[in-house]
């Protein structure tokens, strides 16, 4: 009978211990990603209440959205690589602290500047999480199934926004302290995630020198990707513009055009566009990438048209149903466009290209939101929505025209 090999047994136990530490890190990182983005989604259903109770205008609300978006973008561009030098855990902890501080600021809102400060802090938290915490998830995900890490890293942030928005809407509706309850829940969730990250003693990236040099933004569109960037930018701008419109005005849309100030309805309106986007990314995998870009952008344009028509008809089912289709088609078109660009470049060019994609997307959301906010002072939102129809149609026609010219 063969004697057991003590060295092999010790090696197996060591591997199991490392896998256990890694899995705890994966759970902590995943919950952190949810917590940070849930905190950013929690205030959205309260925007109409802020407008009425604090005397804010729709223009003020759009400023809050623009400030949030630019905070995400600036943090992502400047600090996007910092966790490669300081480690995943410290930067994830910083993201959680910023998210909790943003929620704490919004606990006692008393004016526009407080709202903007809270949203900037939450935006900075999301910028750190979108880089460091997503990388933390990828680094600690179990090896099997092989798709789990990528699926978690790319989709959990959207899930967090939806959970935060729906949870914030429900708490604002059911709690005697509608403005405080969503923020307190967000703080509790971020503290729980923070404790789990501290307890997860495995950091997949050690501290090393060079952190200051990493603060230089790397934004580049490699030569090989440039023929595709115009069409892809049309998708990025038109789809993210609609998301920014909903983030700024969904509660006001619900109150003015759908006949209810219930924050749960406002949350459903926002979630109808944001929630289906990860499913659209999954659908894209079943469609050839070039066709997916065209199908996604054309379907998106029709869905935005239906949303605008639903606003004119004051139809909640049409607005929400069309929002679901818009979110799904956005996921299809956006991921197809990103995939087409990445397929044209080498691995060492991914970081600069992804920074360029992020910059186009966030600016494409922030600038139309700012313009819409100023127009909302003199125009009805349903009229402004037709401008987004034109933007979506322009994006679809641009893609069709470029594809027709190159075939």
Regions found by a protein language model. Name each.
Residues 73-112:
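Conserved MFS/SLC helix-loop-helix module at the cytosolic interface between two early adjacent transmembrane helices
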Residues 102, 113-122, 317-325:
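Paired small-residue
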Residues 144, 148-198:
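Helix-loop-helix hairpin linking two adjacent transmembrane segments in secondary transporters
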Residues 265-289, 303:
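Transmembrane alpha-helices of Major Facilitator/SLC transporters
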Residues 291-335:
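C-terminal transmembrane helical hairpin of 12-TM major facilitator-type secondary transporters
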């Amino acid at each position: 009978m063969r004697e057991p090999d003590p060295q092999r047994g010790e090696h197996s136990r060591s591997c199991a211990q490392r896998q256990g530490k890694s899995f705890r890190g994966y759970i902590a990182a995943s919950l952190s990603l949810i917590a940070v983005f849930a905190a950013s989604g929690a205030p959205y259903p309260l925007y109409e209440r802020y407008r009425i109770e604090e005397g804010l205008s729709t223009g003020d609300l759009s400023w809050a959205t623009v400030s949030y978006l630019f905070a995400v973008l600036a943090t992502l561009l400047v600090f996007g690589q910092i966790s490669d030098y300081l480690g995943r855990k410290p930067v994830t902890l910083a993201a959680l602290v910023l998210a909790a501080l943003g929620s704490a600021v919004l606990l006692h809102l008393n004016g526009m500047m407080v709202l903007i400060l809270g949203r900037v802090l939450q935006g900075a938290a999301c910028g750190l999480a979108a880089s460091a915490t997503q990388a933390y998830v990828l680094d600690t995900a179990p090896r099997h199934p092989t798709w789990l890490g990528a699926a978690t890293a790319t989709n959990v942030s959207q899930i967090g926004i939806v959970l935060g928005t729906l949870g914030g809407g429900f708490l604002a509706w059911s709690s005697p302290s509608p403005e405080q309850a969503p923020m307190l829940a967000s703080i509790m969730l971020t503290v729980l995630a923070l404790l789990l990250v501290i307890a997860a003693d495995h950091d997949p990236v050690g501290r090393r020198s060079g952190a200051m040099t990493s603060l230089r933004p790397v934004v580049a569109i490699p030569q090989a990707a440039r023929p595709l960037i115009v069409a892809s930018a049309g998708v990025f701008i038109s789809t993210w513009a609609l998301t920014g419109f909903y983030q700024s005005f969904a509660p006001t849309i619900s109150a003015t055009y759908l006949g209810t100030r219930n924050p749960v309805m406002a949350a459903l309106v926002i979630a109808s566009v944001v929630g289906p986007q990860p499913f659209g990314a999954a659908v894209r995998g079943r469609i050839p990438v070039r066709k997916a870009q065209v199908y996604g952008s054309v379907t998106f344009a029709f869905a935005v048209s239906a949303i605008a028509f639903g606003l004119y008809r004051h139809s909640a089912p049409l607005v929400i149903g069309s929002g679901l289709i818009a979110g799904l088609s956005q996921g299809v078109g956006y991921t197809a466009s990103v995939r087409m660009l990445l397929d044209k470049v080498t691995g060492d060019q991914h970081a600069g290209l992804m920074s360029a994609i992020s910059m186009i997307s966030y600016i494409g959301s922030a600038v139309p939101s700012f313009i819409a906010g100023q127009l909302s002072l003199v125009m009805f939102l349903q009229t402004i929505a037709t401008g987004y129809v034109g933007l979506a149609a322009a994006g679809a026609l641009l893609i069709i025209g470029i594809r027709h010219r190159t075939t």
